[in-house]
From Swiss-Prot:
Protein name as it appears in the record: Lipoyl synthase, chloroplastic
Cofactor list: [4Fe-4S] cluster
Catalytic reactions on record: [[Fe-S] cluster scaffold protein carrying a second [4Fe-4S](2+) cluster] + N(6)-octanoyl-L-lysyl-[protein] + 2 oxidized [2Fe-2S]-[ferredoxin] + 2 S-adenosyl-L-methionine + 4 H(+) = [[Fe-S] cluster scaffold protein] + N(6)-[(R)-dihydrolipoyl]-L-lysyl-[protein] + 4 Fe(3+) + 2 hydrogen sulfide + 2 5'-deoxyadenosine + 2 L-methionine + 2 reduced [2Fe-2S]-[ferredoxin]
EC number of this enzyme: 2.8.1.8
Organism for this UniProt entry: Ricinus communis (Castor bean)
Region feature Disordered, mapped onto this chain: 32-64
Gene Ontology BP, a term: lipoate biosynthetic process
This protein's UniProt keywords: 4Fe-4S, Chloroplast, Iron, Iron-sulfur, Metal-binding, Plastid, S-adenosyl-L-methionine, Transferase, Transit peptide
Molecular function as annotated in GO: 4 iron, 4 sulfur cluster binding; lipoate synthase activity; metal ion binding
Residues annotated to bind [4Fe-4S] cluster 1: C95, C100, C106, S341
Length: 364
């Protein structure tokens, strides 16, 4: 799942506060418009208690957000066009829901003009509770909408994007983890708009390799699954049902299930990982022939989520990009604001162009 960012100016659904705040201490503040009377307005403000933070959550006063993480408001002609289309089509995008800092770059198409967006399938409620993510959770979320695959395809076919990323919450309540629903959506899209490039950013399907195969053979162009963090921090960062080896097995099986399948993964930095641990994780991904890697800064959604241990500098991100490509990744997107689906269309096209150039040079 992609990391979601929290914007305090956005009104969050009641279920979010119920999930994240009811376990904390309550402070009652009485706000009166006039002198105390029967018409006095009372507002209950709920704040996190230090007792409920846990050993890995809360904010570290010694770690200050640097200037390089500040972004200008998104703008541009293509951005406005896509935004208007989204509104009329009523599509649920991770770009907007997660307040992604790269929304302007992706929707405008960056330097290559390839507009990219990320659509969330299977609802907005996850069956897991990873400590970095602000998506609401439930053991029994609402059943998937059976019309969603076709409706999504119809909407996307009429929308001016060249590259679409399909992702979803984890659905451990479904027998196949939602793989069949994903597959139906991809097939419907390709039928209506064959030229569109489709990337699927998936869950681990509980390690069900048959579910992985179902999706791999649906017609998608890129299979993405995130290991999220280094091996040592897995149990701290991710839900216990996720796992480092399980994620690697999913990526490995996707690569081996179909010749030429492009695979992709992502790692968040700033969670306390060491350079050697990150090198180990990158080596493990290359050992199973993962093609594309994205590296970005972890940003804490709320004080109840994992503490940011470090803000990695842009220079260090540049080093990791160079290092990653030196050990064999076909493309590495590395930067403080990079996220899993960051300008995904550009990454895919650059990878393909680089591959074609190499093949041409190799021919006699």
């Amino acid at each position: 799942m992609e990391q979601t960012l929290f914007n305090p100016s956005i009104s969050m659904p009641k279920s979010f506060y119920h999930k994240h705040i009811t376990i904390s201490s309550r402070i009652q503040c009485q706000l009166s418009t006039n002198s105390p009377s029967s018409n006095t307005k009372t507002t209950t403000v709920t704040v996190p208690s230090k007792k409920t933070m846990g050993p890995y959550t809360g904010r570290d006063p010694n770690v200050k957000k640097p200037e390089w993480l500040r972004q200008r408001a998104p703008q541009g002609e293509r951005f406005q066009e896509v935004k208007h289309s989204l509104s009329s089509l009523k599509l649920n995008t991770v770009c907007e829901e997660a307040q992604c800092p790269n929304i302007g770059e992706c929707w405008n198409g960056g330097g290559d003009g390839i507009a990219t967006a990320t659509i969330m399938l299977l609802g907005d409620t996850c069956t897991r509770g990873c400590r970095f993510c602000a998506v609401k959770t439930s053991r029994n979320p609402s059943p998937p909408d059976p019309l969603e695959p076709q409706n999504t395809a119809l909407a996307i076919a009429s929308w001016g994007v060249d590259y679409i990323v399909l992702t979803s919450v984890d659905r451990d309540d479904l027998p196949d983890g939602g793989s069949g629903h994903f597959s139906e959506t991809v097939q419907a899209m390709k039928k209506l708009k064959p030229e569109i490039m489709v990337e699927c950013l998936t869950s681990d399907f509980r390690g069900d390799l048959e579910a992985v195969e179902t999706l791999v053979h649906s017609g998608l162009d890129v299979f993405a699954h995130n290991i999220e963090t280094v091996k040592r921090l897995q149990r701290i960062v991710r839900d216990p049902r996720a796992g480092y080896e399980q994620s690697l097995s999913v990526l490995k099986h996707a690569k081996h299930s179909k010749e030429g399948m492009i695979t992709k993964s992502s790692i968040m930095l700033g969670l306390g990982e060491t350079d050697d641990e990150l090198k180990e994780a990158m080596a493990d991904l290359r050992a199973i022939d993962v093609d594309i890697l994205t590296l970005g800064q972890y940003l804490q959604p709320t004080p109840l989520h994992l503490t940011v241990k470090e803000y990695v500098t842009p220079e260090k991100f540049a080093f990791w990009k160079e290092y990653g490509e030196s050990i064999g990744f076909r493309y590495v997107a590395s930067g403080p604001m990079v996220r899993s689906s960051y300008r995904a269309g550009e990454l895919f096209v650059k990878t393909m162009v680089k591959e074609r150039s190499s093949n041409s040079a190799a021919k006699p």
